[in-house]
Amino acid sequence: MPLPLFALAVAAFGIGTTEFVIMGLLPNVARDLGVSIPAAGMLVSGYALGVTIGAPILAIVTAKMPRKRALMGLIGLFIAGNLFCAIAPGYAVLMAARVVTAFCHGAFFGIGSVVASNLVAPNRRAQAIALMFTGLTLANVLGVPLGTALGQAFGWRATFWAVTGIGLAAAAALAVCLPKNLAMPDTSITREFSVLKHPQVLMVLGISVLASASLFSVFTYITPILEDVTGFSPRQVTYVLLLFGLGLTVGGTLGGKLADWRRMPSLIATLALIGIVLALFAGTMHLPFAALATIFVWGILAFAIVPPLQIMIVDRASDAPNLASTLNQGAFNLGNATGAWLGGMAIGSGVSLVSLPWVGVAMAVAALALTLWSASLERRPVAVPTEYV
């Protein structure tokens, strides 16, 4: 891995850890701060809201900054946010600190994707983005379990102190490894926002929302599925989630290679396979070994779509990629929240856990339909705004 990509991956590891580790610490946080579990759960929603709101704001604020300075500033915000999480005296301050921390998330991955794609040869750009996002998948495999164990042993604040340390290590890696002469975007606020007039950019954002909703409509409720339907113990569920995380890691690498080979066909095939695997999961969740195989393959497919979607947004907004790339991170998080809400609504309306994967299938089919429409438009000439000519 080239050193600049390694530095970006270290930062991605820290950001991914702080995003997801709170899920394993909710009982500890609720007990320590004297709030209910649902109230503590809002710390997850607050983070997602921070990503969605902060991504476009910071993309515009940093549009004229040198890329290295922008990334260093964003990781500095990440460090400060986690520091305030660690010392938060109460729930309100912790929520505010979570939102501030989330502000850097979308902008960092958005700008980082553009930087990563410019560090390598044109035929390896998707793989470069996948390498950066490897940090995010490793956060699920290693960062979240270790952070949860640390928080359970020494208190949830210890986890945020540790993540602050990861942020400092990431800042040092970025300072040393990122070149100073990174390409500066020749852009303006008007040009950045003009990408929203491009139908293909909007389609990619829509695909990202639907694909992410397909995952989280089921994965949000994976623990009760595995315990109540499959029959795994809570301890065994931890190992199943580790297996899913390994699948995510494999999927990110595979998705990068496929996107550099045949981007649109590989995306279409992956979305179709996601729908098929989720449909199969409705049956295999009753059988422990079959469920394990299905979950691992699902993990591979779930993250294999990220590199092609990220490089597509960069290409389709080639004159002003920073805002579009950053908005795509917001789209993924909007899909996370939408999927969790749809799954919860389905369960609340009487849909059983066994039937829940069909909600994910519906979202995957919708994402596939939008992708096929995008592909059909891509094959024929279309009128585009003058900014792209």
Regions found by a protein language model. Give the residues of each.
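Helix-loop-helix hairpin linking two adjacent transmembrane segments in secondary transporters
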Residues: V93, A121-P179, Y221, I225
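Cytoplasmic helix-loop-helix junction between adjacent transmembrane helices
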Residues: A97-G135
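C-terminal transmembrane helical hairpin of 12-TM major facilitator-type secondary transporters
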Residues: P265-L309
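Paired small-residue
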Residues: L77-F84, A92-T101, F289-V297
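Conserved MFS/SLC helix-loop-helix module at the cytosolic interface between two early adjacent transmembrane helices
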Residues: I53-A92
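Helix-to-loop junctions at the C-terminal end of transmembrane segments
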Residues: A55-P66, G251-R263, I347-G348
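Helix-breaking motifs and short loop linkers at transmembrane-helix boundaries and internal kinks
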Residues: G34, P66, I87-V93, G231, ...
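Intracellular juxtamembrane helix-capping segments at the cytosolic ends
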Residues: F108-V120, A304-A317
